[in-house]
Design a protein with these regions (language model features):
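N-terminal beta1-alpha1 cap of cysteine-dependent amidohydrolase-like domains
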Residues: 1-183, 188-228, 234-269
């Protein structure tokens, strides 16, 4: 029936009257259309946290170490968007580093998750030339690698793996808290994967691989447990987020952003 819809609309109406919570969507200017479903998922998650969410686009191609503090000023959370190609990627690393070192809740999706892994390798593990094989075929530290089954397939977008894949979550992780269950299924396609040869080093330095595909041992979710909320997913949770069933990771991300922002505001007083 219409009951759930009515309840949602009422809740949304109330949320609309709250002080907007600013979330930075860091991405490439020409991908605005591709980010539509992310904007909607963030807005829905806001309603479920009884807050109005203002999604503020931050152009990664213009971000530098010098202007990042100004660009992310007043942001309660940072979402590192998906997207192909090298252009604008250095700006994503700048945003990730700033958010990580200032403990601003951060959510990286697909390429955004890969950027989270690369930034950590460069600035925490000390592999300054770490990269993805997609961006730099000759990188000595390919923390993101092309998938084994893809190596023989050269055409882009040919057979990126797509479909629902099982993923097992580590108990006690932020991802597990969000879903409230250990076994999840998510749909996605990608040609690049986290390089498991580096897994032990990442984990020792504080970034944990908390979502693993049991069949292929692929890392699907990474997070930094000691930060308030710093999570990256290989899959696209925005595609399965709906008005009546908002994706749990978006809801958890906004919840953490609200809590973190309010804490910071209190500290200022």
């Amino acid at each position: 029936g219409l009951g759930p819809w009515r309840a949602f609309l009422e809740r949304r109406h109330k949320a609309e009257n709250t002080e907007p919570l600013h979330i930075a969507l860091v991405g490439k200017y020409d991908l605005q259309d591709a980010y539509k479903s992310i904007r909607e998922a963030l807005s829905q998650a806001g309603t479920y946290n009884d807050r109005k969410v203002s999604v503020d686009f931050v152009n990664s191609e213009k971000l530098t170490e010098e202007n990042v503090a100004e660009a992310l000023k007043g942001m309660a959370g940072v979402l590192i968007g998906p997207g192909f190609g090298e252009r604008g990627i250095s700006g994503k690393f700048v945003a990730i580093k700033y958010a990580r070192t200032h403990d601003i809740p951060t959510f990286g999706i697909c390429l955004g998750m890969q950027c989270i892994a690369i930034e950590f390798a460069r600035n925490v593990l000390g592999y300054t030339d770490a990269d993805s094989r997609e961006m730099n075929e000759k990188t000595p530290h390919n923390v993101i690698d092309i998938m084994e089954e893809q190596k023989s397939i050269t055409n882009m977008g040919g057979t990126m793996r797509l479909g629902a894949y099982e993923c097992i979550l580590q108990k006690g992780s932020k991802a597990y808290e969000a879903y409230g269950t250990e076994h999840i299924q998510e749909r996605h396609r990608h040609r690049y994967e986290f390089n498991n040869q580096y897994k032990a080093e990442y984990e020792a330095a504080g970034m944990k691989c908390v979502g693993i595909n049991p069949e292929s041992d692929l890392v699907e979710i990474v997070e930094i447990p000691k930060l308030k909320w710093f999570v990256g997913t290989q899959f696209h949770p925005e595609y399965s987020s709906t008005v009546l069933n908002p994706h749990p990771l978006f809801v958890a991300f906004i919840k953490a952003s609200v809590e973190s922002f309010e804490e910071k505001e209190k500290a200022k007083k």
